[in-house]
């Protein structure tokens, strides 16, 4: 049996995307046709194992962009759906909608159940508020060359006093000496790889050397907020959450074309709207430039050795496909260094693009540049065949239908 998730298509048109309701066992098993397929992820907790304790005392916010109509219908979420809320959920949903981003903490058993319902549809999200010092997170920083960036990164991480593991991915001798000096100066443990294997293998080495139940991965060109782990760690109190990431924005210092581009189109910046990271939404993947992961939700090794680029996307997609929840919390912001060299800019994008074919092979139909709706295709087709009046009529119908769904505001 198939269920359909309504997705926003081209120019605000709406299309239906079928999703098979597969069992958890089917979702967690790797594709046997894949050569060197990664090991299956551990199964996520059952409803009983998950429980409800994680919601108690947790302030929630209404997710921006989600419409709430007639006291019972929501439009939006992740994945994007039109939902008629159960009667038991509506009173708390109304209160939370009115509170907005100011937040509201569920107080009764009924409100706790309603909160979980809203969280699981991406209609609400937990607000990232620190609850005190964190003692169950290790930080892993992979680095290759770029010792100066690492020094800034380690200085920013010092504020929370967490254990830090630096993994030098076989940097040249001069860089390696400076990396070792920086690690020692900040009290970080240093692992030196004998051979360069790429960021995924470096992260895996750091992950294996850590012992904490949660591991924060931070790229060496990141300048972290002073309390980013303390604020994001409570979101992992939900046993179903495998990973959570902050927003990563470009640290723009100048006005060059590359810097201005990075400020508005950085591949690491997933936007300002919180989201569950699932197929078919704007935040459909997360980079590991800054992310906290649950050890119990990862495979061994966590990052696929066969992927030198895109291994972070692969892991997040495998988590989603296995039934885990991955959250994006942009209220917390880290900054990444902008490299202004045109050569570096082009090389990085060529590198990212190089992972597309392998990711598509491992996750068929997830890596699609555009998902136009039938109405959108109708508009483009009419224009292509010289029928602007028909194109205008289709576009007008789509616009009117969307306005009816979303309401006047």
Model-derived features with residue positions:
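Short, flexible, basic/aromatic active-site loop/helix in glycosyltransferases
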Residues: 246, 262-283
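Acidic donor-binding segment of Leloir-type glycosyltransferases
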Residues: 155-192
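N-proximal low-complexity "stem/linker" segments adjacent to membrane-targeting elements
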Residues: 24, 35, 47, 88-91, ...
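Acidic, low-complexity/disordered tracts enriched in E/D and polar residues
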Residues: 16-98, 120
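Glycine-rich, basic loop-to-helix element that forms the pyrophosphate-binding segment
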Residues: 193-210, 274-281, 318
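Catalytic donor/gating beta->alpha subdomain of glycosyltransferases that bind UDP-sugars
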Residues: 313-365, 396-409
């Amino acid at each position: 049996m198939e269920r359909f998730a309504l997705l926003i298509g081209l120019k605000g048109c709406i299309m239906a995307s079928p999703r098979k309701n597969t069992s958890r066992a089917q979702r967690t098993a790797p594709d046997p046709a894949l050569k060197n397929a990664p090991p299956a992820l551990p199964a996520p907790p059952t409803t009983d194992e998950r429980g409800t304790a994680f919601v108690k005392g947790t302030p929630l916010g209404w997710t921006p962009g989600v419409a709430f109509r007639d006291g019972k219908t929501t439009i939006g979420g992740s994945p994007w759906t039109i939902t008629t809320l159960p009667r038991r959920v509506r009173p708390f949903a109304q209160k939370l909608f009115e509170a907005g981003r100011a937040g509201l903490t569920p107080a009764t058993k009924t409100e706790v159940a309603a909160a979980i319902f809203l969280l699981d549809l991406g209609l609400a999200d937990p607000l990232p508020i620190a609850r005190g010092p964190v003692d169950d997170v290790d930080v892993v920083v992979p680095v290759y060359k770029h010792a100066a960036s690492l020094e800034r990164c380690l200085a920013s991480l010092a504020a929370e006093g967490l254990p830090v593991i630096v993994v030098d991915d076989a940097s040249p001798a001069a860089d390696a000496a400076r990396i070792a000096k920086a690690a020692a100066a900040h009290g970080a443990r240093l692992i030196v790889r004998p051979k360069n294997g790429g960021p995924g293998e470096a992260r895996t080495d750091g992950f294996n050397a850590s012992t904490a139940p949660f591991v924060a991965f931070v790229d060496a060109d990141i300048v972290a907020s002073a309390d980013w782990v303390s604020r994001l760690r409570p979101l992992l109190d939900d046993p179903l959450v495998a990973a959570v990431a902050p927003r990563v924005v470009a640290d723009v210092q100048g006005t060059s074309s590359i810097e201005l581009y990075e400020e508005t189109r950085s591949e690491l910046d997933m936007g300002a709207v919180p989201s569950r990271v699932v197929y078919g939404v704007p935040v459909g993947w997360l980079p590991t430039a800054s992310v906290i992961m649950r050890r119990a939700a990862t495979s061994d090794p966590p990052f696929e050795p066969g992927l030198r680029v895109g291994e972070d996307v692969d892991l997040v997609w495998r988590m989603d496909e296995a039934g885990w929840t991955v959250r994006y919390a942009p209220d917390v912001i880290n900054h990444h260094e902008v490299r202004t060299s045109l050569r570096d800019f082009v090389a990085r994008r060529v590198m990212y693009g190089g992972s597309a074919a392998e990711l598509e092979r491992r996750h068929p139909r997830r890596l699609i540049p555009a998902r136009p709706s039938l109405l959108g295709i109708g508009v483009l087709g009419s224009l292509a065949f010289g029928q602007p009046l028909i194109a205008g009529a289709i576009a007008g119908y789509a616009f009117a239908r969307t306005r009816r769904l979303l309401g006047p505001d």
